């Protein structure tokens, strides 16, 4: 947004300025667009600064000083993930930048943007949001620096973090600042993180001990504690749990795992408690998660007047938009519970679904776009087939703390009917101007097995030749560490998929997404997977190395070498050479990987897989001497 655009709207000043590390795309798949439209819908004047130059504060001044606050996001993904490969090399393409150009956002973007804003406007409130701030809200392992870093709120000169899907939080913050409240007094909004002075925290704890009959060693209460009625010790310590401090978790991996387990199990909007984590210069306090949006609220958010286009100032397309331009978001949340995924911590396990009518209205608008070719190329949310699903316990106690929804097997309390999704897909197919409705990715195949009608409809109408699914691995030890279904479930799905395709008279294929280097995965496990692929014909180029990203179970395993829920020790491949060997075993047919595959087989004592026999992964040949 430019100053000229502000003037064209007849505005003399803005209420809120959003700063993002992504290009600005006015589409509901982009977090900044949603937050901007939601604030605008609530009556606020909103400006957006996309991908500012961060070497000095000048770009942050171009829209002037907002009346209420700045909101800062690194973008749709963590800036480390956007900028760097799993091997920590610079990426050669950025899907969230015009033309895929790299170098338009810094590493640790949320912190750097906040610093520049503070230089430009020292007294302005700053609210952090988005996946980077959300997943770094506690002390966390940082893969780039290979150490435990403080909460992002301790490192950035910001006042609040909005974590999760932040529509309700951001509007309430704006309304309360509009009403004249000081941002430092806004401490009671679910789904936010705030900070307290160390002295005030010690006094609050002292008062808590006094009320519990212990000796209060604190002096007179600070002004912060004395004036804030929400800091009644008796009530506070009923609603909040203290976890080990930054100093403790950064020095002891077992303590890190213990702290992780505590806050992971409290991420429940119904029964969860707030979390307190002391840091050397401040106290980080997370309120319990915000509730999911209702169906009516979700419908409203997704039917705001998005243009579905990039900002007109861009001369090149933004690749991320091209992937989702003609797709439809049906729901939020995921109860899959994969250890390496951040969605559980960001969107929660409880599914919030839009109404069928709302989705149909959006689909009709897509058909009216001049570049629409009759194909809706994606229908779903974090997964394709959890739309409309629910559990009878969610309303009263949220998602269960003592068990997962799908692992090690599908919970019988879960309603796994695809009936509502089937109705939606059928009605989408009937819309004038729609030739195909595809769901070629994101299908949770263990859920699909629960509903044969859905699987048959999927094969008959909603795949364009290939179905991309993510078994991730075929070693039981590794899929257990990932909290993913084992190969037996995969094989059952593949059999049913092939049977339904034969029935439909279609020739369609499964494309597997696989992962190397996950905690718990050894060279022997990778060889087991290579042998499975050899025997079952699932060789694929769709592979990735495990990347430790903040606040996932797998990252906790990677850093600590422990399962945070059982305390069991786990093998972790940290050596670059072993990581390369693990990845090479997934591409054992590639001649460029011969030496790495040979070394892996030699190290694992499996040279029986080198030779000309059918079972061999690579042929025997004269190796280059090093």
UniProtKB/Swiss-Prot annotation:
GO terms for molecular function: 4 iron, 4 sulfur cluster binding; catalytic activity; iron ion binding. Keywords: 4Fe-4S, Iron, Iron-sulfur, Metal-binding, S-adenosyl-L-methionine. [4Fe-4S] cluster binds at residues 334, 338, 341. Residues 206-227 are annotated as: Disordered. PROSITE patterns: RADICAL_SAM. Residues 320-589 form the Radical SAM core domain. Transmembrane segments: none annotated. The keyword Transmembrane helix does not apply. SUPFAM superfamilies: Radical SAM enzymes (SSF102114). Its cofactor is [4Fe-4S] cluster. Pfam families: DUF3362, Radical_SAM, Radical_SAM_N. Gene3D superfamilies: tm_1862 like domain (3.80.30.20). HAMAP family: UPF0313. Belongs to the UPF0313 family. This is UPF0313 protein MM_1287. It comes from Methanosarcina mazei (strain ATCC BAA-159 / DSM 3647 / Goe1 / Go1 / JCM 11833 / OCM 88).
């Amino acid at each position: 947004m430019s100053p000229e655009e502000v003037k064209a709207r007849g505005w003399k000043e803005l209420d809120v300025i959003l700063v993002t590390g992504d290009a600005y795309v006015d589409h509901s798949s982009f977090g900044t667009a949603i937050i901007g439209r939601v604030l605008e819908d609530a009556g606020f004047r909103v400006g957006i600064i996309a991908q500012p130059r961060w070497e000095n504060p000048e770009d942050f001044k171009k829209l002037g000083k907002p009346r209420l606050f700045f909101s800062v996001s690194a973008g749709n993904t963590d800036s480390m993930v956007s900028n760097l490969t799993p091997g920590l090399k610079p990426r050669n393409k950025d899907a969230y930048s015009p033309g895929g150009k790299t170098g338009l956002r810094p590493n640790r973007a949320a912190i750097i943007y906040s610093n520049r804003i503070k230089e430009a406007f020292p007294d302005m409130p700053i609210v952090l949001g988005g996946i980077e701030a959300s997943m770094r809200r506690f002390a966390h392992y940082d893969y780039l620096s290979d150490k435990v870093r403080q909460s992002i709120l301790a490192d950035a000169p910001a006042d609040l973090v909005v974590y999760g899907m932040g529509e309700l939080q951001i509007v309430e913050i704006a309304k309360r600042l509009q009403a004249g409240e000081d941002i430092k007094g806004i401490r009671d909004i679910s789904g936010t993180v705030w900070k307290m002075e160390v002295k005030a925290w010690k006094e609050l704890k002292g008062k808590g001990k006094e009320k519990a009959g212990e000796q209060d060693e604190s002096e007179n209460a600070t002004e912060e504690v004395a004036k804030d009625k929400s800091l009644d010790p008796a009530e506070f310590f009923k609603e909040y749990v203290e976890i080990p401090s930054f100093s403790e978790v950064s020095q002891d991996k077992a303590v890190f795992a213990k702290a992780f387990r505590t806050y992971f199990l409290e991420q429940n909007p119904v029964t969860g408690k707030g979390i307190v984590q002391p840091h050397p210069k401040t106290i980080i306090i997370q309120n319990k998660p915000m509730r999911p949006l209702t169906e009516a609220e979700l419908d409203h958010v997704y039917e705001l007047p998005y243009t579905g286009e990039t900002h007109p100032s861009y001369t090149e397309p933004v690749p991320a938009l091209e992937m989702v331009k003609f797709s439809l978001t049906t729901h939020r949340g995921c109860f899959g519970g994969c250890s390496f995924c951040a969605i559980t911590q960001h969107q929660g396990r409880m599914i919030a679904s839009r109404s069928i009518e709302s989705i149909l209205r959006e689909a009709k608008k897509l058909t009216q776009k001049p570049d629409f070719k009759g194909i809706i190329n994606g229908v779903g949310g974090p997964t394709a087939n959890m739309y409309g699903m629910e559990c009878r316990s969610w309303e009263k106690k949220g998602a269960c703390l003592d068990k997962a929804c799908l692992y090690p097997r599908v919970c019988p309390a879960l309603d796994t009917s695809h009936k509502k999704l089937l109705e939606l897909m059928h009605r989408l197919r009937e819309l004038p101007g729609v030739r195909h409705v595809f769901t070629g990715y994101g299908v949770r195949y263990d859920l699909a097995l629960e509903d044969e009608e859905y699987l048959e409809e999927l094969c008959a109408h909603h795949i364009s030749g290939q179905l991309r699914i993510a078994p991730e691995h075929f070693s039981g030890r590794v899929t257990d560490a990932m909290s993913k279904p084992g190969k037996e479930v995969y094989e059952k799905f593949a059999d049913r998929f092939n049977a339904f395709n034969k029935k439909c008279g279609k020739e369609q294929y499964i494309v597997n997404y696989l992962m190397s280097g996950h905690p718990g995965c050894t060279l022997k496990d990778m060889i087991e997977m290579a042998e499975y692929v050899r025997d079952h014909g699932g060789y694929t180029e769709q592979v990735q190395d495990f990347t430790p990203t903040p606040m996932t179970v797998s990252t906790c395993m990677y850093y600590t070498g422990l399962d945070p829920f059982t305390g069991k020790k786990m093998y972790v491949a940290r050596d670059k050479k072993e990581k390369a060997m693990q990845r090479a075993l997934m591409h054992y047919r590639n001649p460029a990987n011969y030496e790495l595959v040979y070394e892996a087989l030699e190290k694992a004592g499996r040279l029986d897989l080198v030779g000309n026999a059918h079972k061999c992964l690579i042929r025997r040949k004269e190796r280059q001497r090093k």
